[in-house]
């Protein structure tokens, strides 16, 4: 990392458009140096690795902007910076030619990058409350500590969270994030959780265990995904994980209620078991926002293997497009599907209800209660082995000038889907079951796009439903990060 003087021009990455056109993005450049501020907490060799993998590889002006955006994003994701900004200083041209001088001399613009980093807080402690769907409420206490570079060279952050709520009896979570390289993060979780699994009467689930995951985001693919003329910030990553825990399942106490009121399926879930999961997740997200996108597309594919117990796969696709000024009208389509196969040598031994798919709810198929679709035993939702769900949504800014710039949106939706137990029949038969007799709903409402979460208040109207489905006609409130 070096500094330089004699600066002729300067431009901030926050407003790059004035210097960009079709030809300027191809202009040859050389990064002559990087001037940094706020980097005392970072080991120099670690920061140099991030620079070498991003902006130092740039050979054109367009590549420099792409790589600078990747660098800023990566520093924040890896807990190295709370915020990062860059500006470029242009020092005029030098000239290069090949040794045999068979080609014309090429002007090469020299650039010095000014990287300003807002260091993350070394220690934070906070307490608060969370509110969610179905009258969920939680109180939490959280501590977070940044490990000093003199103790551990790799950027590492540890987190401790203690939580208690209406459905979570108690929760203890220890999180450790270590940046192995500019492209990968190692995450270790140690947890102890006791919570109520939401059914008609419910199960009390206790889990004690650990989860080790490695997230890998190949930087070289950003050259293909990123467009310097737009505000898109594409994400592509693989995540591999190993999770093992001891799971205890108990039937909830219902006071004087007789035990026989529980279904046989629910009673069969009681007991203890060792749960081990090997998993992989692939995500390609080209949307401009995670919770409330206005354009772009997303693909997410998840796979889980529990040796000797089950194999589970799930696919999600989302496409968003907007029209008119300031994205006045936004159209979103989403489809999800999943399949679970019982690998147990004893086919009569069922997959645990918590490992099965569930459908229905204010953030899933609207117009139905949470876990309101699919197979039931008496009054209990027992989950399914395969599902399909889809949603069409149209969002519009409020048609009044005083509030059209607000974060509120009018919302119309059409949702549908089906959840089945295929009993390890052929895939063809399973697809046949999923392709007909869907439960569907429609409705209108109001959406609030808050930076921390998305709020929905919809008036829902179920159109078609199965006999055992639990419908929700009328107003339905939704709160969350991801919606169908």
UniProtKB/Swiss-Prot annotation:
Its main location: mitochondrion. Keywords: Membrane, Mitochondrion, Mitochondrion outer membrane, Protein transport, Transmembrane, Transmembrane beta strand, Transport. One of its GO terms (biological process) is protein import into mitochondrial matrix. Component of the mitochondrial outer membrane sorting assembly machinery (SAM or TOB) complex, which is required for the sorting of proteins with complicated topology, such as beta-barrel proteins, to the mitochondrial outer membrane after import by the TOM complex. Belongs to the SAM50/omp85 family. Component of the mitochondrial outer membrane sorting assembly machinery (SAM or TOB) complex, which at least consists of SAM35, SAM37 and SAM50. Associates with the mitochondrial contact site and cristae organizing system (MICOS) complex (also known as MINOS or MitOS complex). Its C-terminal part seems to contain many membrane-spanning sided beta-sheets, that have the potential to adopt a transmembrane beta-barrel type structure. This is Sorting assembly machinery 50 kDa subunit. It comes from Saccharomyces cerevisiae (strain ATCC 204508 / S288c) (Baker's yeast). The lineage of its organism: Eukaryota, Fungi, Dikarya, Ascomycota, Saccharomycotina.
